[in-house]
């Protein structure tokens, strides 16, 4: 199996056929022995170092070198820029070895065009099966029998009815087969605007639209080649529309590319799909696929582009109320009027509360002005209660001062003096009370003695 040419830049071009067409090339390869160019004394590191620095390719894996050797132009743009001019367009000897020398004249190679948009887990198997069937058609005997099992498996919808044609039909259908997938795939010039075609395209024989035999052969042979990126068969027992195959085989300007995630949704639809209908169905079934469009390009018909623009505008208009619902800066329509809280304030001013009244609970402020008014009202009530408490305390001190004999005439007595004199006066009153209690006891004892004397005098 020949490997990549490493004449110009040996350190940059891969030598592993399985990792050649990966979009993310590993920095180091285990099979490279001449990576270090320091000299004969330099020794490569061990296997653990290679495993540490190896960058694993991301899935899906690229096709093997055995199935893309006949490719006239590489699919990876970085590899294309690094390849030399001689190796960029393939080796004619290798193409002749496979019996596909005619592929060199086709600028849009169907294998690369179909392989440039891998999608799904079975893309590699479909590509290998398509290339193997091409090789069988190219090497087949003159008396070709019924269709091969691979072709039957790739065409369960009955598109392989052209496989029963004779050797002449197979030989005539081979160039059309190789040119047919290019019409169904995306042109690289649309995706990559830089000029990459180095050769002039060879003239491709076009089958007339009026011959049903040749059209059937083209339709049957083109089905396995387009299985890599085209949609799967619509219904198992329903044959495909022959007119659509004729239009696709004779028109090189129309392109069609359907992704694998749309295959399940488009099983009951025809091959030509209205974009507006697809948008309505996708928007109703999956609410997240708002900006996802079905890739159906018809340059001759400009009505589909207008329909796509109108559908996208409709979808964007549907999303507008959702953004408006989450606009927290907008004023809420459920805010009550600001006339109710001032009525409570007027009520509190008209009927003042008593001394130990409970302050009404604070209402939810709807504006800064209402919050300021409530704060001032609360401060005013607090001042009133504090003033009443101070007046009561002052009147109590004045009453206490009036009861102290030393401070009756002193109107400017301080509160501390009033408290001290009142304490001394209380202590003096308590001492006087104690003396009076002792005198009372003496008097009661004297009374008892006198009563006894009176009784003795009466008995005598």
From Swiss-Prot:
A motif (9aaTAD) lies at residues 76-85. Residues 255-274 have a biased composition (Acidic residues). Residues 159-169 have a biased composition (Gly residues). GO terms for molecular function: DNA binding; DNA-binding transcription factor activity; protein dimerization activity. This is N-myc proto-oncogene protein. Residues 19-47 are annotated as: Interaction with AURKA. The keyword Membrane does not apply. The 9aaTAD motif is a transactivation domain present in a large number of yeast and animal transcription factors. Disulfide bonds: none annotated. It comes from the Eukaryota. Residues 429-450 are annotated as: Leucine-zipper. Phosphorylated by GSK3-beta which may promote its degradation. Phosphorylated by AURKA.
């Amino acid at each position: 199996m020949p490997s990549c040419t490493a004449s110009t830049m040996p350190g940059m071009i891969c030598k592993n056929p399985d990792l050649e067409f990966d979009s993310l090339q590993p920095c180091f390869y285990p099979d490279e022995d001449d990576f270090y160019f320091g000299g004969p004394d330099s020794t490569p590191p061990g296997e653990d170092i290679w495993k540490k620095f190896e960058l694993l390719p991301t899935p899906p894996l690229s096709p093997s070198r055995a199935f893309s050797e006949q490719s006239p132009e590489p699919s990876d743009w970085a590899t294309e820029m690094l390849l030399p001019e001689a190796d960029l367009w393939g080796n004619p000897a290798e193409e002749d070895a496979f019996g596909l020398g005619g592929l060199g004249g086709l600028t849009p190679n169907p294998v690369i065009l179909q392989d440039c948009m891998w999608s799904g887990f079975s893309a590699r198997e479909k590509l290998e099966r398509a290339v193997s069937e091409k090789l069988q058609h190219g090497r087949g005997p003159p008396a070709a029998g019924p269709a091969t099992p691979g072709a039957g498996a790739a065409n369960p919808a009955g598109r392989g009815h052209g496989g029963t044609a004779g050797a002449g039909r197979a030989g005539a259908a081979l160039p059309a087969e190789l040119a047919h997938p290019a019409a169904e795939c995306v042109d690289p010039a649309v995706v990559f605007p830089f000029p990459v075609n180095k050769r002039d395209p060879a003239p491709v024989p076009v089958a007339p639209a009026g011959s049903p035999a040749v059209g059937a052969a083209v339709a049957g042979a083109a089905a396995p080649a387009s299985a890599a990126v085209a949609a799967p068969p619509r219904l198992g027992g329903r044959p495909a529309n022959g007119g659509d195959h004729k239009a696709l085989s004779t028109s090189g300007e129309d392109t069609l590319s359907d992704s694998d995630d749309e295959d399940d949704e488009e099983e009951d639809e025809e091959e030509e799909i209205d974009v507006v209908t697809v948008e309505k169905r996708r928007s109703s079934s999956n609410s997240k696929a708002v900006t996802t469009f079905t890739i159906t390009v018809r340059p001759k018909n400009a009505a589909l582009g207008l329909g796509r623009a109108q559908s996208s505008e409709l979808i964007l208009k549907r999303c507008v109320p959702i953004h408006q619902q989450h606009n927290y800066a907008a004023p809420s329509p459920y805010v009550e009027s600001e006339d109710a809280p001032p009525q409570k304030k007027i009520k509190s001013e008209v009927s003042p509360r008593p001394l130990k009244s409970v302050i009404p609970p604070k209402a939810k402020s709807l504006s800064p002005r209402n919050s300021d008014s409530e704060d001032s009202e609360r401060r005013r009530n607090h001042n009133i209660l504090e003033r009443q408490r101070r007046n009561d305390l002052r009147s109590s001190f004045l009453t206490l001062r009036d009861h102290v004999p030393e401070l009756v005439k002193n109107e400017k007595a301080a509160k501390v003096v009033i408290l001290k004199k009142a304490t001394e006066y209380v202590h003096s009153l308590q001492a006087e009370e104690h003396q009076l209690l002792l005198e009372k006891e003496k008097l009661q004892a004297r009374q008892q003695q006198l009563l006894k004397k009176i009784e003795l005098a009466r008995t005598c």
